[in-house]
Amino acid sequence: MNKINTQLENSMNSAIEFLAIALNATGHNSKPVLLHSIRVGFYLYKKGYNQDIVLGGLLHDILEDTETSINDLNDKFGIRVTKIVAANSFNTSIGDKTEQFQDMFNRCKEYGKEALIIKAADIMDNSNYIQFVNDKKTINWLLFKMKSFINISREEIEKEDVWKE
């Protein structure tokens, strides 16, 4: 294994440990956030994306699902990872859930390809759960959310592996 992969894997271990500790201390999402975040990060790693994208994928839910601050995240993982994670996080001051998603998708687009790649991997992983939803209204809302993301991100990431899957 070359030095770059070893460094990346060490950083991934640090991110997973940081996330697990934060979720244990303050996590307030009943979904299996840790496993979801690991799947997203490892998917991006296997696809050969850079360190900022992989770490951003591992940590993409940490700001909205724990009490971790932007400053703590920045101190541990740097400004680029922090900005990618912030772009992928809900603005909780927006009350309407659809508006929260639209705002997040727009911030991902503003940040650029790295944030959009992570959001695509996140949505792809979450889409595996749609089969367990029995409520037609929820299914329609989830499909609307996916279509909205596709529309906003197509131009930026349609040539990326994450888009093709």
Residue ranges: model-predicted function:
Residues 1-165:
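Active-site helical microenvironments for divalent-metal-assisted chemistry
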